[in-house]
Amino acid sequence: AVVNELGFDACIDYKAHPDVKSLAKALKEACPDGIDGYFENVGGHLLDAVMLRSNAFARVAMCGMIAGYNGEPIPMTLPQLILTNRMKIEGFIVSEHMEAWPEALKELGTLVATGKLKYKESVAQGIASAPEAFLGLLKGKNHGKQLVKLV
């Protein structure tokens, strides 16, 4: 459903794969030619599986690692792949790019308005639902961006 709805070539529910081996197999089916670029928001065994499927000189933009936010940090188990695949991994903090915000907002707004960019969001109603929404975010219960509508 997500593939057709959002226009993806493939989609993998990482939550349905409890370990690196299972997830790497699913990635191999979805990306038979390997992975050249990846935007990281999850970490944990998802990052390890992506690294196993990464091509030489793959690039990773790290924006978050939510898998380790609600407990002990989850270690990267295959750091040697950064070297052997000559990967470039770079942290990305949106607040360091605020000068690009007006242009990005205009461009992304146009893409959303024309239907060229689609998104998913989970909306909780009322401030009283905020704690549950936040905990759900940490447990991966949301779909897309988690919002709390105050009024």
Model regions and ranges:
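Adenosine-nucleotide cofactor-binding segment
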Residues: A1-A49, S95
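Well-formed, non-transmembrane alpha-helical positions, independent of function
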Residues: A1-V2, L81, E107, G136
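Conserved beta-strand scaffold positions in the cores of enzyme catalytic domains, especially
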Residues: C11, I89-G91, K145
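A structural signal for short, well-ordered beta-strand elements
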Residues: A16, V123-G126
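Short conserved AdoMet
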Residues: P32, N55, N142
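Residue-level signal for the nucleotide or nucleotide-sugar donor/cofactor binding architecture
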Residues: D33, E99, Q125
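Glycine-rich phosphate-binding loop and adjacent beta-alpha segment
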Residues: H45-L117, L150-V151
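C-terminal capping/lid region of NAD(P)-dependent oxidoreductase domains
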Residues: K116-V123, P131-V151
